[in-house]
């Protein structure tokens, strides 16, 4: 039932915010009251797991509940610290969920307001794509992603020490966040579409030819490393490199890449495009380790929150761009909430 509400909420908000965005200046930013107006319902939906989890059978909810009540027995020390800090103020599990939701959603909405060209449309994209999966189910990785998105402006402004500090904090929420350090080595102020499009083609062709990038890399380190990794890989099904979600993401990336000159003035465009590229490329690159590929793809995909709204500038008639944008958002929302059933509530 809740996923139906999210879908209806996304549809209504998408149409409403698109109209509002078009009728105000592009420099439109959230006032404090507007910030709270958007924040409260999102936090409410995120906290709904507290009331619906038993009926929905949310495994993640029950795992977090057990971890919270037995923090000293949790394998991950970072989670133990977070749980004990929250338990110091209150032993209630609801406060634990509220803390994670406030950290994650507040940072995301704040970042959208500060660095998105179309903050309202970015908000719609956020609700359509990563909100249900991350803020309702994967709450630790959601906080890590929120901190990563918040730190992007420091990366672009070449304040690397601050960026490293925030990513280190993100690692405290989820160790997979260490992958975000790699973007320190990316050029932040330029994007060459031909290079990245060609790279995307080469990577997928190589995967189609069954070239195992993980094996090639681990052979340098020693065969034993690949042996253990192959055991993990054998326990999982191979990824569908051209599933519907992946195809939509490739289409959006190519659409933006071919029209990249129109977004040259948006200083965050180059780095977000490269992050989005990585979210797509990680599937064929890490296809032999499906769990790892899916995890990293999910972590990097929220970059679409800031990129998808830009498509309205591609069309000569703005209203066509808005219709196209809303259709893509509804399609992604339907795929995430119903087709793939990422949140079975």
Question: What are the language-model segments listed below?
Answer:
Residues 1-2, 18-101, 335-345:
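TM-lumen/periplasm interface segments of multi-pass membrane proteins
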Residues 33, 55-66, 71-80, 184-296, ...:
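Alpha-helical transmembrane segments and terminal signal-anchor/GPI-anchor hydrophobic tails
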Residues 109-128:
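Transmembrane-helix signature of polytopic, membrane-embedded enzymes
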Residues 136-142:
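Short acidic/glycine- and proline-prone juxtamembrane loop motifs at membrane-interface regions
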Residues 148-162:
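Membrane-interface transmembrane helices that cradle and orient dolichyl/undecaprenyl
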Residues 162-186:
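Membrane-interface alpha helices of multi-pass inner-membrane proteins
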Residues 197-201, 316-335:
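Signature aromatic-anchored transmembrane alpha helix within multi-pass, membrane-resident enzymes
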Residues 294-310:
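Hydrophobic/aromatic-rich transmembrane helices and adjacent perimembrane loops
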């Amino acid at each position: 039932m809740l996923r139906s509400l999210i879908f209806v909420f996304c549809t209504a908000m998408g149409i409403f915010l698109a109209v509002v965005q078009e009728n105000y200046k592009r420099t439109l930013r959230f006032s404090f009251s507007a910030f709270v107006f958007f924040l409260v319902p999102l936090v409410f939906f995120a906290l709904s797991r507290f009331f619906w989890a038993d009926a929905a059978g949310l495994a993640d909810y029950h795992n977090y509940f057990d971890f919270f009540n037995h923090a000293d027995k949790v394998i991950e020390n970072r989670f133990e610290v977070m749980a004990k800090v929250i338990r110091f103020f209150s032993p209630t599990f609801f406060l634990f969920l509220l803390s994670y939701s406030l950290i994650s959603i507040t940072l995301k909405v704040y970042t959208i307001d500060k660095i998105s060209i179309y903050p309202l449309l970015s908000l719609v994209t956020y609700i359509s794509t990563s909100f249900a999966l991350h803020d309702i189910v994967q709450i630790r990785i959601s906080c890590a992603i929120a901190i990563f998105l918040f730190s992007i402006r420091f990366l672009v402004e070449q304040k690397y020490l601050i960026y490293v500090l925030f990513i280190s904090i993100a690692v405290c929420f989820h160790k997979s966040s260490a992958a975000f350090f790699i973007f320190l080595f990316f050029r932040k102020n330029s994007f060459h579409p031909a290079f990245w499009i060609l790279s995307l083609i080469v990577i997928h062709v190589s995967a189609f030819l069954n070239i195992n990038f993980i094996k090639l890399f681990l052979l340098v380190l020693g065969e034993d490393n690949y042996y253990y990794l192959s055991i993990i890989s054998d326990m999982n099904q191979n990824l569908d490199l051209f599933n519907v979600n992946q195809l939509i993401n490739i289409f959006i990336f190519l659409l933006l890449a071919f029209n990249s000159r129109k977004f040259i003035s948006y200083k965050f465009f180059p780095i977000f495009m490269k992050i989005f590229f990585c979210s797509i490329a990680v599937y064929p690159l890490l296809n032999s380790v499906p769990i790892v590929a899916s995890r990293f793809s999910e972590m990097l995909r929220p970059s679409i929150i800031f990129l998808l709204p830009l498509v309205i500038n591609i069309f000569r008639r703005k209203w066509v761009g808005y219709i196209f944008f809303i259709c893509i958002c509804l399609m992604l929302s339907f795929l995430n909430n119903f087709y793939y059933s990422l949140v079975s509530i």
